[in-house]
């Protein structure tokens, strides 16, 4: 039997403009059924606009939005099999918890006893089975957040859109909810599209992350791929902490930076092509100055609980961030070592679109 690989949601060449301001530029996105996806990017990059376009609250200026293979650009929001959990929860303050969850079902004229069963089940899913009769003003922020999720899940959507649903919670509750949401998604097996500007949250929760900036998706991939192989300076900087150092690709598997040559794992660039080299702070080991592949001078350090964050400078005045379990002496030189596969070489100003364009040109030749 053929496996259905059609994406549940597909966006092709979607743009959105408000007057002169283009807030989405040629968005292409495929979401498979049953996976946890995250849109990650800074404030104002267009994450919410993508969610609203999928939900049917905003019309795309151009391009197509598909649900299960059908174009849904003109389908009203209430007829889409998609529900949204909003950042501010948007609960009805004059209704109790159960009434809030029941609201959408009543609107769809679902029979009363079915409503009761489904509401109870949805409340149990988010561990609020006993709080149905409480007023919204009588529950905590974290519980309100769960009501908002229950209210969306009770509609049995195929896709759940979550717009920064954890941003109002304190750090501890936020971590707990990350686990719970991930667990819920896996148990229900529906597609989640989650929006955040918190890279740690995105890395912890997602099957796949789309990193956005200024209305564009710069890179999509698994958390490990995006962390280990950032496509450009922006992604490297946005996902985790990085040392990004200017360099030159001498030939395949050989790169130069800070005036020295290093073996690396990258290939396929022009000889002597100008590049940027990414080295993660946790991939650098400190050794005696005369044994290092590079020598840097320690400027300052902070104790971060399970490691020391050390700031140092090389002779070209590049700043180096190093994570070490041992402290270093400020003002003193230290040696840094790293493995060839810890060096990640990036082309300058690389984006997936630019890469794809190059590939197409290559295929046409
Ligand atoms: N109705 C509107 N009219 C004009 N501009 C809008 C409108 N809605 C959004 N924008 C603009 O579109 C851009 C993208 O907004 P969007 O809300 O999608 O960003 P975001 O990535 O979700 O940001 P945040 O993380 O702050 O919520 C912003 O510059 C915003 O000001």
From Swiss-Prot:
Domain (ABC transporter) ranges: 9-239
Superkingdom as given in the UniProt entry: Bacteria
EC number: 7.6.2.11
Record carries keyword Isomerase: no
Primary enzyme class: translocase
Catalytic activity: ATP + H2O + polyamine-[polyamine-binding protein]Side 1 = ADP + phosphate + polyamineSide 2 + [polyamine-binding protein]Side 1
Membrane topology, record value: Peripheral membrane protein
InterPro entries: AAA+_ATPase (IPR003593), ABC_SmlMolc_Importer (IPR050093), ABC_transporter-like_ATP-bd (IPR003439), ABC_transporter-like_CS (IPR017871), Mo/tungstate-bd_C_term_dom (IPR008995), P-loop_NTPase (IPR027417), PotA-like (IPR005893), PotA_ATP-bd (IPR017879)
Record keywords, A-Z: ATP-binding, Cell membrane, Membrane, Nucleotide-binding, Translocase, Transport
Any one GO CC term of the record: ATP-binding cassette (ABC) transporter complex
Keyword Lipid metabolism: no
Chain sites annotated for binding ATP: 41-48
Location of the protein in the cell: Cell membrane
First-listed, main subcellular location of the protein, grouped into a coarse class: membrane
Molecular function GO labels: ABC-type putrescine transporter activity; ATP binding; ATP hydrolysis activity
NCBIfam families: potA
Family of the protein in this entry: Belongs to the ABC transporter superfamily. Spermidine/putrescine importer (TC 3.A.1.11.1) family.
Subunit structure: The complex is composed of two ATP-binding proteins (PotA), two transmembrane proteins (PotB and PotC) and a solute-binding protein (PotD).
Protein's job: Part of the ABC transporter complex PotABCD involved in spermidine/putrescine import. Responsible for energy coupling to the transport system.
Name the record gives this protein: Spermidine/putrescine import ATP-binding protein PotA
UniProt organism field: Lactiplantibacillus plantarum (strain ATCC BAA-793 / NCIMB 8826 / WCFS1)
UniProt gene name: potA
């Amino acid at each position: 039997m053929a496996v259905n690989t059609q994406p549940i949601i597909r966006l092709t060449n979607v743009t959105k403009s408000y007057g002169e301001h283009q807030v989405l530029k040629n968005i292409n996105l495929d979401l498979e059924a049953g996976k946890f996806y995250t849109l990650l990017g800074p404030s104002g990059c267009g994450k919410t606009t993508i969610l609203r376009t999928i939900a049917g609250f905003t019309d795309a200026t151009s391009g197509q939005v598909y649900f299960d293979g059908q174009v849904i650009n003109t389908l009203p929001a209430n007829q889409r099999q998609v529900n949204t959990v909003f950042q501010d929860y948007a609960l009805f303050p004059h209704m109790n918890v159960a009434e809030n969850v029941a609201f959408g079902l009543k609107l769809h004229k679902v029979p009363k006893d079915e409503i009761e069963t489904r509401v109870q089940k949805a409340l149990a899913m988010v561990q609020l089975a006993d709080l149905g009769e409480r007023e919204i003003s009588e529950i905590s922020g974290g519980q309100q957040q769960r009501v908002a999720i229950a209210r969306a899940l009770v509609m049995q959507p195929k896709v759940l859109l979550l717009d920064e649903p954890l941003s109002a919670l304190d750090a501890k509750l936020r971590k707990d909810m990350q686990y719970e949401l991930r667990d819920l998604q896996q148990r229900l097996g529906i597609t989640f599209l989650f929006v955040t500007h918190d890279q740690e949250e995105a890395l912890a929760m997602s099957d796949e992350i789309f990193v956005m900036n200024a209305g564009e998706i710069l890179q999509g991939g698994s958390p490990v791929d995006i962390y280990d192989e950032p496509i450009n300076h922006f992604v490297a900087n946005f996902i985790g902490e990085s040392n990004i150092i200017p360099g030159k690709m001498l030939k395949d598997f050989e790169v130069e930076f800070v005036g020295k040559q290093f073996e690396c794992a990258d290939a396929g660039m022009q000889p002597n092509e100008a590049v940027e080299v990414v080295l993660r702070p946790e991939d650098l080991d400190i050794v005696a100055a005369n044994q290092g592949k590079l020598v840097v001078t320690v400027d300052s350090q902070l104790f971060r609980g399970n490691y020391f964050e050390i700031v140092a400078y090389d002779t070209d005045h590049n700043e180096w961030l190093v994570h070490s379990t041992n402290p270093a002496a400020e003002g003193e030189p230290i040696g840094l070592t790293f493995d060839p596969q810890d060096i990640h070489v990036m082309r300058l100003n690389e984006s997936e679109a630019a890469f794809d364009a190059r590939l197409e040109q290559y295929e046409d030749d």
